[in-house]
């Protein structure tokens, strides 16, 4: 988990440091939103992620909101999720609503200079064979977040699925989800 935390911190800092360098006179807090399923749920940002971003931006200039839930598909965050075929689920977006409640509480009466969304999720969608709609779901989720925050400049860091099932034996769409994650950030 320490290597994962280090990698996420480096990626998030890379995005936001470039923002900071572009506008040295900008004011406001740097908001980091961490969400996804089990690997993100197990992440303890207070141990390394939060101290690293506070060291970079100053402790008074950082807001970190983490809300994650293990074993969940992206449809629990993306409200307009649609399967490639078949019946649509009854509930979508409930975990997103929970996340946004936390974000709104943390940013109330705060000026936000930058937003970085750190997302670690995909195993459940690989298992449920939703690879065909995963990239569109990521794009929709980021658009949903941008709309709700009233921003077009959200940085996004994706914790890509590992290479453990490159033969798609346990999770039929493992490599499809990995490619969708890669294509999304390209």
Protein language model regions, located:
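Cell-envelope and extracellular/periplasmic
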Residues: 21-186
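Bacterial N-terminal signal peptides
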Residues: 6-16
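Positively charged n-region of N-terminal signal peptides that target proteins for export
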Residues: 1-4
């Amino acid at each position: 988990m320490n290597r994962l935390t280090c990698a996420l911190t480096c990626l998030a800092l890379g995005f936001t440091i470039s923002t900071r360098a572009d506008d040295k006179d900008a004011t406001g807090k740097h908001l980091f939103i961490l969400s996804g399923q089990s690997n993100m749920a197990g992440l303890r940002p207070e141990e390394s992620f939060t101290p690293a971003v506070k060291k970079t931006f100053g402790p008074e200039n950082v807001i970190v909101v983490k809300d994650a839930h293990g074993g969940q598909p992206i449809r629990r965050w993306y409200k307009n999720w649609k399967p490639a075929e078949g019946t649509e689920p009854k509930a979508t977006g409930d975990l997103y609503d929970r996340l946004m409640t936390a974000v709104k509480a943390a940013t109330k009466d705060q000026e936000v200079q930058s937003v970085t969304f750190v997302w670690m999720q995909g195993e459940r969608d690989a298992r449920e064979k939703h690879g065909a709609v995963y990239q569109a779901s990521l794009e929709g989720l980021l658009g949903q977040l941008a709309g709700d925050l009233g921003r077009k400049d959200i940085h996004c860091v994706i914790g890509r699925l590992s290479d453990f099932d490159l033969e798609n034996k346990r999770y039929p769409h493992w490599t499809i989800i990995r490619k969708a994650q890669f294509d999304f950030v390209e």
